[in-house]
Amino acid sequence: MKRTVYCGEVTDALVGQEVTVNGWVQRRRDHGSLIFVDLRDRTGLVQVVFDVEECGADLFRKAEQVRSEYVLAVRGRLVHRTPEAVNPNIPTGRFEIRALDLRILSPAKTPPFYIQDDLDVDETVRLKYRYLDLRRPEMQRNLILRHRVTKAVRDFFDEHGFLEIETPMLTKSTPEGARDYLVPSRVNPGKFYALPQSPQIFKQLCMVSGLERYVQIVRCFRDEDLRADRQPEFTQIDVEMSFVERDDVLSMMEQMVARVFRDALGVEVPTPFKRLTYAEAMARYGSDKPDLRFGMELVDVSDVAAGCGFGVFKGAVEAGGQVKGINAKGCGGYSRKQIDELTEFVKTYKAKGLAYIALGEGGEVRSSFTKFLTEAETAEIVRRLEGEPGDLLLFVADQPDVVAAALGALRVEMGNRLGLRKPGEFNLLWVIDFPLLEWDEEENRFVAVHHPFTSPHPEDLDKVFKEGATREELAAIRANAYDLVLNGVELGGGSIRIHQRPLQNRMFELLGFTPEEAQAKFGFLLEAFEYGAPPHGGIAFGLDRFVMLLAGRQSIRDVIAFPKTAKATDLMTDAPSEVAPKQLQELHIRTTV
């Protein structure tokens, strides 16, 4: 029987006609001479009725064999349900199909969990039986949304003159940052390919090639410890443009993101997006990816603290640190136990403690430190944080990086507790002017904040070549880089690139590469720059993360068809797995475990 309509797409126009539907049995109910089957496909479900008086005894006996998740083809007459039988909870709840023919296309074992959205089952079971998990409507909605996003991306870039160009999956290992996944070469014994962490160099070479506008929805690989928003293999929306400056890239990406929201969600997002410098973001929010759906900004009270009688505050400022606070509105009634919990929370970010002022509704004040302050000092601190009766003011005193990390995380924690991070609300932000370099204490050298091909900020270019520059001077150099942040999550990052060999050589030098090392790893790129490279820049968006946020999910595993676990394993296929000794011999390698 050939399908004539999808289960979720029956309409009034088809009432009275014979239709054929295919799908899986969601539920079967036996009422004596009537059998009701809810048949499901990816569009929804529809009720099928087997009435022994209408369909005959033979067909009815066949319907009695049907169980959950059987795959069926059903032909019948579409009718309206009686008013008392209407189900208002599903789009097709006014209709039912009175069965005339049935074909069991495939029987099914009893599944290890119910195929339904409100599922309470361990994720390891879901991943082991992923093909069953993906039958659930919410998982199918996630993948349909992912398709809509990628279609909107491709349509947009095609309309704006971009070429979708594939770059190699087997490439050269240039370890800088995360570990590479290595692939041994059978025909070149002792040598290895690497799976790409990013197509960065190849897309820059596309610009040197004169292709001008490149885009690729590309798989990337990083051998790193996983989190809720990380996978060993992931997908990027990768973009590069020639003859552009920063604002050209940002404007184009704003249009693309707005198009995705419009086409995939039916949501209009205002452009241009807000911009903050890295320094502003860290000072005001304690994070380079702040969630701007709520305020609760960090307020600096270091100048008041410097002259106060509270030794913790005064000592921190004298040691080159700072004192900052946030106002948790309406939390003035927090108990000492609750405040102690917050103190333990900030200690996980290396803060030594948490000071507080609780302003009671009746004007009373509870505090861990105001007894050491004058009334004027206390009043000034409360004024700066815009404290009102019922508020809880929370303070951290330490070095700037610790204050930012601890208070920034506490701000998000309090935002969650107070319900300020509203789902369904989207706040987009560009963070610009990142540092170009950061000092790595373990390796005793500078590393690139983004990557080695990021161009310095035009205003700081002369500082890159300054003879005898101190570590502090080099750390203060800004990058011509930018990140797009959505609801406190980094959605993508990019930069204007270096396109001249002398500057790229200098960048490698600052990162501790000898000329020989730079030539061995990146000689082909350096040589390409000598044949006329245009100014260029680009960006890469994490597609998995983007779809996760649009879908309102907490993990990218929910928007990837077949994801890995937190230990980078595939529970369904049992990958990674051991291989036969013969395979290792052919590759000229052996394991040591």
UniProtKB/Swiss-Prot annotation:
Provide the residue span(s) of the region labelled Aspartate: 200-203
Q: Where in the cell is it found?
A: Cytoplasm
Highest taxon in the source lineage: Bacteria
Function, as annotated: Aspartyl-tRNA synthetase with relaxed tRNA specificity since it is able to aspartylate not only its cognate tRNA(Asp) but also tRNA(Asn). Reaction proceeds in two steps: L-aspartate is first activated by ATP to form Asp-AMP and then transferred to the acceptor end of tRNA(Asp/Asn).
Can you state which reaction this protein catalyses?
Answer: tRNA(Asx) + L-aspartate + ATP = L-aspartyl-tRNA(Asx) + AMP + diphosphate
Query: What's the protein here called?
Result: Aspartate--tRNA(Asp/Asn) ligase
SUPFAM superfamilies the UniProt entry points to: Class II aaRS and biotin synthetases, GAD domain-like, Nucleic acid-binding proteins
Instruction: Cite the Gene3D superfamilies for this sequence.
Output: Bira Bifunctional Protein, Domain 2, GAD-like domain, Nucleic acid-binding proteins
Concerning InterPro entries, the annotation shows: Aa-tRNA-synt_II (IPR004364), aa-tRNA-synth_II (IPR006195), aa-tRNA-synth_II/BPL/LPL (IPR045864), Asp-tRNA-ligase_1 (IPR004524), Asp-tRNA-ligase_1_N (IPR047089), Asp/Asn-tRNA-synth_IIb (IPR002312), AspRS_core (IPR047090), GAD-like_sf (IPR004115)
- Organism equals Symbiobacterium thermophilum (strain DSM 24528 / JCM 14929 / IAM 14863 / T)
Q: Any one Gene Ontology biological process term?
A: aspartyl-tRNA aminoacylation
